Amino acid sequence: MHHQKQQQQQKQQGEAPCRHLQWRLSGVVLCVLVVASLVSTAASSPLDPHHLAKRSFFDIQCKGVYDKSIFARLDRICEDCYNLFREPQLHSLCRKDCFTSDYFKGCIDVLLLQDDMDKIQSWIKQIHGAEPGV
């Protein structure tokens, strides 16, 4: 009987470090998953600075002259609109058809940029390649 108790105690003492190690590994795995999730979320953000590449210019059907600074200014309007409403699709809908969509017009209105319309229209004309109709 005494021998069985000793074996049980030894077994329990051996399991304690294993359980502790399992908890630590579980914590490490959880941390890695959380960090990976945050990184993937940040990478898929519509406000990713790499989305201003020339490829993006063509992706939204711009057929005019690519000017990175003008493109960035127009895109900033869509970013501000997205930040205001936090609707996941708003940023891409605002940029649709080279900044000539009704969503872009709506963003101009809610951001109170009507006074800048002449300047904005000239920017759109340059990168769109035609009269914007905004």
Curated annotation (Swiss-Prot):
GO cellular component terms listed in the entry, alphabetical order: extracellular region
Gene Ontology biological process terms from the UniProt entry: circadian rhythm
Coiled coil: none
Keyword line: Cleavage on pair of basic residues, Disulfide bond, Hormone, Secreted, Signal
Protein name per UniProt: Ion transport peptide-like
Highest taxon listed in the record's lineage: Eukaryota
Disulfide bonds: 62-98, 78-94, 81-107
Gene3D superfamilies: Crustacean CHH/MIH/GIH neurohormone
Organism: Schistocerca gregaria (Desert locust)
DNA damage listed as a keyword: no
